[in-house]
Amino acid sequence: IQGTIGASAQIGRTQGFDDAVEAHDNWTTLAQQSGEFTQAKGQEVMESILKQSGDDIDVVYCENDNEAFGAIDAIEAAGYEVGGEEGQILVMSFDTTNAGLTDTLSGKITLDTECNPLHGPRVQEIIEKLEAGEEVDKQAYVDEEMFAADDTVTSIKVDDADYEVTTITQDIIDGRAY
């Protein structure tokens, strides 16, 4: 379930998904539709996909938590289960909102990839350094993580880099600033 078509997050996340599908001969994309980054549209899109391909769906790739919430609602309303057990539909998401991580902890979201919203103070620091005539790095990377319900997958390789997957706990959720 894609985000709003043309949004930078949609473009990057869709490209990452398409690249992964292309790299795996045993992966098939059954449908690709925009959920417009909303729960309501995510649910509507998932309902449509379930009518077309319900028993063939193994994984639903949502480009944000709101779409994942809608997809989960549709999957469960159609009588399917979400989660990591055999025969269930796995839901992947982005954002790591508090509610998204809570669904990850419960096993409804299998993997939630962070989109850290706390860039403001870091950008302010860079601007202040530039205004003071100091040199700054040409690129600034944002610390982001991936969270899973269990430790089945401990890292994910993207290009030539390995990224750790953290098993979510209630302590992690409670300790986050957002």
Protein language model features and the residues they cover:
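Short beta-strand elements at the ligand-binding edges of bilobed clamshell
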Residues: I1, Q32, S106-P117
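Short beta-strand->loop
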Residues: I1-A9, L30-E36
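Hinge/cleft segment of the Venus flytrap/periplasmic-binding protein
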Residues: Q2-S8, A20-A23, C115, H119-Y178
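Hydrophobic alpha-helical segments within soluble ligand-binding/sensing domains
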Residues: G12-Q15, K41-Q43, T96-G100, N116-A132
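Ligand-binding cleft/hinge of the Venus flytrap
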Residues: T14-N26
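Hydrophobic alpha-helical
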Residues: F17, A31, G35-T102
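Conserved beta-strand scaffold positions in the cores of enzyme catalytic domains, especially
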Residues: T29-Q32, V91, D112, M146
